[in-house]
Each structure stands twice: as structure tokens, then as C-alpha cells.
Amino acid sequence: MADKLIIFDTTLRDGEQSPGASMTKDEKLRIARQLERLRVDVIEAGFAASSNGDFEAVRAIADVIKESTVCSLARANDRDIARAAEALKSAARSRIHTFIATSELHMEKKLRMTREQVLEQARLSIRFARNLCEDIEFSPEDGYRSDPDFLCRVIEAVINEGATTINVPDTVGYGIPELYGNFIRTLRERVPNSDKAVWSVHCHNDLGMAVANSLAGVKIGGARQIECTINGLGERAGNCSLEEVVMAVRTRRDHFGLEVGIDTTQIVPASRLVSQTTGFIVQPNKAVVGANAFAHASGIHQDGVLKARDTYEIMRAEDVGWSANKIVLGKLSGRNAFKQRLQELGIELESETDVNAAFARFKDLADRKSDIFDEDIIALVGDESVTHEQETYRLLSLEQQSATGERPHAKVAFAVGETEFHAESEGNGPVDASLKAIESKLKSGAEMLLYSVNAITSGSTESQGEVTVRLQHGGRVVNGVGADPDIVVASAKAYLSALNKLHSKNERVAAQG
């Protein structure tokens, strides 16, 4: 029987460290439920000690997830570890993941600690954690750039104290596949008690090799856990992509000889949910989950695929969750048909009240758009009016006028709590005029870093526009997403969505692994 490869998803922790990718508790819950449907082995739900908001998110996820192990990150100190254990108290399966840097650069410049101090702190942190939880993971931060002799001492010590998983991060994405794989193998060969723990890899994508390095760590190094994120989400150039490593191991089972427990038909729904929630659009040519991943434009390729799919396809689109049934509903569709399609898409709303709210949004959209696609449904169930996210700012109505040769003008009505405001402004275009009207009353002081428009579905001018707005204020960066057939309305929704996140998100302590 083939060995099992453990899939450790850190979308909700390391992925969230992407500038603008911060998520609310309810958003994290929705993604965690999808990760469980995906049958991820371990869900790193957050960094419980970083903020009250993250603590509550980890605790809420621990309350509802029953099959996957729920994990919280913690620095190698008693306070962080105790906070993680408290947040995970209700979990059916829990793990504490603690870390401390071991490279000379990090120890000297960041920690200002000697080797012996780091070794002792690592040892004591694992000893303390084992009193609170049986499943303990240890990561030597910047492990790949650490001195191998010292790293072996640290790893041997923490395994002796009870660490059950040893994760060796390439924190800055410096590794090359052959070198990184051999590095993991050398550590496993030199650490006397290496067989007492599962070995894991965590690779960043700064040189574009996170997936290749992770697979080398498994094939050459003998690791049996990969840490990864949906869509490769993560700070800087991102993390190892879950969908890519899973499909690589599954498609090339002849080479890796490993099994993964992932339900691959849930990969595309997970990708869409993370993209819609964070506002990070998936590039069309992204492997496995990009819109063009199974598209064939060349006539020769098209002819070959029509005759035999395996001429140019090594995977089947439906195996990763792409549906051939695109047009699903219309304005005559009833509530039961809508609810059934939600289930088919893997969308789980918390109550019948939420289903009713989503159906009301669907009927409103169907009155304005003849064909409703899966992507439209995914966008509308993420709307704050459906999810009951805390809405300090809420769009009520928008009217805009523009004509050739005239300066566009917009009138906007919106609510701040229970107070209604009316504002109007001119601008360089209808979107600019609308957002200036909102700012004329709010005076938020936020700086816009990004404005982008993406067609939710292609091939028709009826398509909804999905707008992402990235704002920065007080050192925090957030994304807001809005969808509507009218891109001016979508823009106002996205802007207010971002302001809601700025208003509600707690300060965080950054963690890197």
C-alpha cells in the first residue's frame, strides 16, 4: 500500500499574510468548511495569539470542523502556546504549530539570541506544548538557510521533547529543487531520532519553485507532509500551490508512489471561493484552476482532443471540479432549484434565513440578467447582505450621468450604521464620481492601492463585473470585492466593502514560516 502524503493547508494563516488578503471570521469559516469538503488533512486556521479577532476565528473553526485537524500557529513562548491551546479547546482534532528562527541572520538580527538560547527556548516550548496538546509541530523559521549542524541539534532536541511533526521551511524561497530535496534528506539521515516524527516541507515561491521544491522535499528528502495554500496565496510571490502539488502527486503516482486523501472535485470550488473572498484573481493560465487550464485554441490540439482527450490532456477537467454545465438558472427558477445548485457547488449556508437572503439576491440578479452562471452564484453568496458580515457602511442607491464631452456626475445614497447619507460629485468617469461622492461624506483618509475589474463570466456583455478595491490606512491593507451587472454599482460596493474591513479588522502580529 502506498504511503499517505499529508496535505497541510495554510490559506487561512500564511495565505492571509498577502497584503489585502485579510479575512473576517465569517469568511474564514466559509473557507474552512470548503477545505474540509476538500478533505484537507490539516487546516492551519490562524495565529491565535496575534489578535482577539484571530483567536475568535480559530476558536470558531475549531467548533465546526470535525474531520480535518485544526491547527494554530504560535511563537515559541508559553503565552502564545497557551493562547493557541485555548482557541483549539473544542476541536475534534487539534494541533499546535510552534516556531522559532534558527538561521544566523534571524537569530542575530531579529531575535538577538545566541544559538544556545534558541535551542533552549525551542526545547522548553515543545515541553510546555505537549502538556496541552498531543499533536505538536515544530518549524525552525528560515530553516533552509540555517547551519545544518545546529539545525540537527535543534530538531533532535524538540523530537526528544515530543514534537510529532518537523517542518523545514524555505522561508524566503531561496531553494533549488535538487538542493532543497537533498537538504531534507541530509537532515533526516543525521538526526538520530528522525523516525519519531513526520517530516514536512513549507516552500515560498520567490524564485517560482515552491511547488518543485516541495515535491523534491517529498521525493528526494522523504518528507510526508506538504504545507500549501489554495491558489498559491501568500505574501510576496506566494506559497506552494495546493492544487498543483495534489494533482502532480495524483497524476504522477507512478513517480511519487504516494496517495493523497483529497477530493479533487472540490479543488475548483475552493479556488473560486478563495479568489472571490480575497479579491485575488486567478490568472487564466494558472495550472489546474486557471480559466484556460483545459482550453485548446490550436486547431491541431482541438482535433486531437475531439478524437481522444488524452492526446493533449493529462487530467480531466471534471476531476478537479470544472463543470461542463455552465448555464444553470434563470428568472423562472425556484428556490428549490437554487438551493440544489448551491449544494452541487459545495456552498453551505448556515441557515434557512441565509438561503432566503441569497435567493432574494438571485431573483434580483435574474431580473437584470437572463442567464445565471455558477460564477454568478458564487459571487452573490459572498455578498455581505447574505453573509451577515458586520456592515458599518452599506450602499442604498446610486445614480450617475455621463455623456460625450460632459463631465460625469454621480449621486449616491449609503448608510453608516442606521444613519442615511446622500452625496453627489463629479469625476473623471462615473466610477471616479461615485467614489468621490462617498468620500465627500466619509473622509476616510484611506489610500487606494488597487482598482481592478474582472468579468465574472465571459462571452456576453450581460456578465456581472467583479470589482476589487485595495485600500491602505493606518498601516493596514485590505481588499474589498463587489459584484453587479453595473460596474459602477460594483465599484461602490467594493469600496464600501473595503471600508467595512478597515473599520472592523483588528491589528495583527505578522508571522512568517
From Swiss-Prot:
<dbReference type="GO" id="GO:0009098">
    <property type="term" value="P:L-leucine biosynthetic process"/>
</dbReference>
<comment type="pathway">
    <text>Amino-acid biosynthesis; L-leucine biosynthesis; L-leucine from 3-methyl-2-oxobutanoate: step 1/4.</text>
</comment>
<feature type="binding site">
    <location>
        <position position="202"/>
    </location>
    <ligand>
        <name>Mn(2+)</name>
    </ligand>
</feature>
<feature type="binding site">
    <location>
        <position position="204"/>
    </location>
    <ligand>
        <name>Mn(2+)</name>
    </ligand>
</feature>
<dbReference type="Pfam" id="PF22617">
    <property type="entry name" value="HCS_D2"/>
</dbReference>
<protein>
    <recommendedName>
        <fullName>2-isopropylmalate synthase</fullName>
        <ecNumber>2.3.3.13</ecNumber>
    </recommendedName>
</protein>
<feature type="domain" description="Pyruvate carboxyltransferase">
    <location>
        <begin position="5"/>
        <end position="268"/>
    </location>
</feature>
<feature type="binding site">
    <location>
        <position position="14"/>
    </location>
    <ligand>
        <name>Mn(2+)</name>
    </ligand>
</feature>
<dbReference type="InterPro" id="IPR002034">
    <property type="entry name" value="AIPM/Hcit_synth_CS"/>
</dbReference>
<dbReference type="InterPro" id="IPR013785">
    <property type="entry name" value="Aldolase_TIM"/>
</dbReference>
<feature type="binding site">
    <location>
        <position position="239"/>
    </location>
    <ligand>
        <name>Mn(2+)</name>
    </ligand>
</feature>
<dbReference type="InterPro" id="IPR005671">
    <property type="entry name" value="LeuA_bact_synth"/>
</dbReference>
<dbReference type="GO" id="GO:0003852">
    <property type="term" value="F:2-isopropylmalate synthase activity"/>
</dbReference>
<comment type="similarity">
    <text>Belongs to the alpha-IPM synthase/homocitrate synthase family. LeuA type 1 subfamily.</text>
</comment>
<dbReference type="GO" id="GO:0005829">
    <property type="term" value="C:cytosol"/>
</dbReference>
<dbReference type="InterPro" id="IPR013709">
    <property type="entry name" value="2-isopropylmalate_synth_dimer"/>
</dbReference>
<comment type="subunit">
    <text>Homodimer.</text>
</comment>
<keyword id="KW-0100">Branched-chain amino acid biosynthesis</keyword>
<keyword id="KW-0464">Manganese</keyword>
<dbReference type="InterPro" id="IPR054691">
    <property type="entry name" value="LeuA/HCS_post-cat"/>
</dbReference>
<dbReference type="GO" id="GO:0030145">
    <property type="term" value="F:manganese ion binding"/>
</dbReference>
<dbReference type="InterPro" id="IPR000891">
    <property type="entry name" value="PYR_CT"/>
</dbReference>
<keyword id="KW-0808">Transferase</keyword>
<dbReference type="Pfam" id="PF00682">
    <property type="entry name" value="HMGL-like"/>
</dbReference>
<dbReference type="InterPro" id="IPR036230">
    <property type="entry name" value="LeuA_allosteric_dom_sf"/>
</dbReference>
<comment type="function">
    <text>Catalyzes the condensation of the acetyl group of acetyl-CoA with 3-methyl-2-oxobutanoate (2-ketoisovalerate) to form 3-carboxy-3-hydroxy-4-methylpentanoate (2-isopropylmalate).</text>
</comment>
<dbReference type="GO" id="GO:0003985">
    <property type="term" value="F:acetyl-CoA C-acetyltransferase activity"/>
</dbReference>
<dbReference type="InterPro" id="IPR050073">
    <property type="entry name" value="2-IPM_HCS-like"/>
</dbReference>
<dbReference type="Pfam" id="PF08502">
    <property type="entry name" value="LeuA_dimer"/>
</dbReference>
<keyword id="KW-0432">Leucine biosynthesis</keyword>
<feature type="region of interest" description="Regulatory domain">
    <location>
        <begin position="394"/>
        <end position="513"/>
    </location>
</feature>
<keyword id="KW-0028">Amino-acid biosynthesis</keyword>
<keyword id="KW-0963">Cytoplasm</keyword>
<keyword id="KW-0479">Metal-binding</keyword>
